[in-house]
Amino acid sequence: MNIVYASDEGYCQHMAVSIVSLIEHNKSEQLTFHILSDGISIEKEDQLRAMVRGYGKKIVFYPIEHLMEELRGQIYGLDTGRFRITTLARLLMGSILPRMVTKVLYLDCDTVVLRSIAPLYRL
């Protein structure tokens, strides 16, 4: 299962709790976490990698800091001041993630998972 989060440094702690809650209730599932990263530090990335790998799962980071400027250049009149890039990135994840990723479940960083997500993912 491919799970996507969009986060900045300030939400890493919340995202970590969400990731652990998801793993704890889906231990038998093959999980790959795709993190759309708006300036998450290398130190935080390393901590998250160690945590996720400790459970035998995968995690990949995709820097998205450049997206806002690209959007302004591509969409005339786009008022990007009203949205954070982590909000817009979830709409563009199809062009950010590798082509081999054909299905994902997007979760907000403050989501706590209390049971298996397999039925939801299989919809």
Task: Identify the function of each model-found stretch.
Residues 111-123:
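Conserved donor-nucleotide/metal-binding helix-loop-beta segment in metal-dependent transferases, i.e.
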Residues 3-8:
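A conserved hydrophobic helix/loop-capping motif in glycosyltransferases and polysaccharide synthases
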Residues 104:
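Short aromatic/hydrophobic "clamp" motif used to bind/position activated sugar donors
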Residues 12-26:
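Histidine-anchored nucleotide/phosphate-binding helix
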Residues 107:
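Catalytic metal- and UDP-sugar-binding loop of GT-A-like glycosyltransferases, i.e.
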Residues 50-95:
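Active-site-proximal specificity loops/subdomain of glycosyltransferases
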Residues 31-39:
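Short internal beta-strands
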Residues 39-46:
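Short, charged/polar "capping" segments at the starts of alpha-helices
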